[in-house]
């Protein structure tokens, strides 16, 4: 007796709302069951790494905002740390606290979108609407410090571009006081919801070994029970002074990854509170005149200051020859920047390690044996953004 079962090849995307970007997925289906999932990437490739080679170190910063455009400040942070490492530049404490504060606000910004859109993919519309109200408040904080709601261009090698406006810390404090009850509301909708658990529990299971072998990081790694977080294991700026826990899952399924992200937001609130309480007075960028432009007041009084400002923004500054790799714990995982300098005002090579790139490669083994509808759930818990995957 011969088995004449015929598999079907199905194209999912790239114009599909559940692919979270321009993902083309070629699925080999046996009826409703997925045999293989082959992701085709590159539809949003802009050659960012090559473009950065032709820009000064200051001009390169906005390119990082446009990678994972849901969490821009975390990526600026990685690039700023890499340049500071080559320059051996000391960052003022106030600037370090501001960076950590906004990195954690960015984490909340990212996770609220992920959990909201994940719920929407599965059929629950309410969490998205509730969480978007909270995201709007964080985007206003972005706008207050940088003038932009999305592509902030706020972090700089040596500090941040501008100090916090008067009253902003009080506004952030009010936000984090009212935010936990909103998270409790989301949890009351989802955590023990029968349909939610049926769609997430035991779907897309990743063992600890598989997570390590595939190079997973962030909630994808911690969801499998590995307590690895760069803020703890390799702290940067003032994270070593912060008191927080690293949430981990047990089963490595979609439900654990959702829950890890939910718990991470509570930990981010703790860190933000500590930043507000400990925020020191002082400078917000290094006093090295080669890195920091003169103030507007000085430029109005001194021709030399005006020339200095013009030269700094047109020619930039020279960075000593050398190479470095700096990584931050971005909301999606380990975001790293390998920087190679030959001593000029432009990087010779800038290699970007995006966490979503590794996570998407694991979609094939995570989807095998599941139904077509479960693939949508798995894609949602990967938390992928094609700006950083395609670069």
Swiss-Prot record:
A GO CC term attached to the entry: plasma membrane
Subcellular location, record wording: Cell inner membrane
Protein name per UniProt: NADH-quinone oxidoreductase subunit D
First-listed, main subcellular location of the protein, grouped into a coarse class: membrane
Origin superkingdom: Bacteria
Statement: the UniProt record of this protein carries the keyword Transmembrane: no
Subunit structure as annotated in this protein's UniProt entry: NDH-1 is composed of 14 different subunits. Subunits NuoB, C, D, E, F, and G constitute the peripheral sector of the complex.
Family stated for the protein in its record: Belongs to the complex I 49 kDa subunit family.
Gene name, Swiss-Prot/TrEMBL: nuoD
Species per Swiss-Prot/TrEMBL record: Rickettsia rickettsii (strain Sheila Smith)
Keyword annotations: Cell inner membrane, Cell membrane, Membrane, NAD, Quinone, Translocase, Transport, Ubiquinone
Matching HAMAP family: NDH1_NuoD
Reactions catalysed according to its record: a quinone + NADH + 5 H(+)(in) = a quinol + NAD(+) + 4 H(+)(out)
UniProt-listed Enzyme Commission number(s): 7.1.1.-
Bilayer topology: Peripheral membrane protein
Described purpose of this protein according to its UniProt entry: NDH-1 shuttles electrons from NADH, via FMN and iron-sulfur (Fe-S) centers, to quinones in the respiratory chain. The immediate electron acceptor for the enzyme in this species is believed to be ubiquinone. Couples the redox reaction to proton translocation (for every two electrons transferred, four hydrogen ions are translocated across the cytoplasmic membrane), and thus conserves the redox energy in a proton gradient.
A GO molecular function held by the record: quinone binding
InterPro entries the record matches: NADH_Q_OxRdtase_suD, NADH_UbQ_OxRdtase_49kDa_CS, NDH1_su_D/H, NiFe-Hase_large
């Amino acid at each position: 007796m011969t088995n004449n079962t015929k598999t079907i090849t199905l194209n999912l995307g790239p114009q599909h709302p559940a692919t979270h970007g321009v993902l083309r997925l070629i699925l080999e289906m046996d009826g409703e069951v997925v045999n293989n999932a082959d992701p085709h990437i590159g539809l949003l490739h802009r050659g960012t790494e090559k473009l950065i080679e032709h820009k000064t170190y200051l001009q390169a910063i906005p390119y990082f905002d446009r990678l994972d455009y849901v969490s821009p400040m975390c990526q600026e942070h990685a690039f700023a740390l890499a340049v500071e490492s080559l320059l051996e530049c000391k960052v003022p404490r106030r600037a370090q606290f501001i960076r950590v504060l906004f990195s954690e606000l960015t984490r909340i910004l990212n996770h609220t979108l992920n959990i909201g859109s994940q719920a929407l993919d599965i059929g629950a519309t309410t969490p998205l609407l509730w969480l978007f109200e909270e995201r709007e408040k964080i985007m206003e904080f972005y706008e207050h410090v940088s003038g932009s709601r999305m592509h902030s261009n706020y972090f700089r090698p040596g500090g941040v571009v501008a100090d916090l406006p008067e009253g902003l810390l009080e506004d952030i404090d009010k936000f984090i006081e009212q935010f936990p009850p909103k998270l409790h509301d989301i949890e009351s909708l989802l955590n023990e919801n029968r349909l939610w658990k049926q769609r997430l529990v035991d779907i897309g299971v990743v063992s600890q070994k598989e997570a390590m072998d595939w190079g997973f990081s962030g909630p994808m790694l911690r969801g499998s029970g590995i307590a690895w977080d760069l803020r703890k294991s390799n702290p940067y700026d003032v994270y070593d002074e912060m008191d927080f826990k690293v949430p981990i899952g047990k089963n490595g399924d979609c439900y654990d990854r959702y829950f890890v992200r939910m718990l991470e937001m509570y930990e981010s609130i703790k860190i933000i509170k500590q930043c507000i309480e400990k925020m020191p007075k002082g400078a917000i960028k290094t006093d090295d005149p080669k890195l920091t432009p003169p103030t507007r007041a000085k430029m109005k009084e001194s021709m030399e200051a005006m020339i200095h400002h013009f030269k700094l923004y047109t020619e930039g500054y020279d960075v000593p020859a050398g190479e470095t790799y700096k990584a931050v714990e971005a909301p999606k995982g380990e975001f790293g920047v390998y920087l190679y300098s030959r001593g000029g005002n432009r990087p010779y090579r800038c290699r970007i390690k995006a966490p979503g790139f590794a996570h998407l490669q694991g979609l094939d083994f995570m989807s095998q044996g599941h139904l077509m509808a479960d693939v949508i759930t798995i894609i949602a818990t990967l938390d992928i953004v094609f700006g950083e995957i395609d670069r």
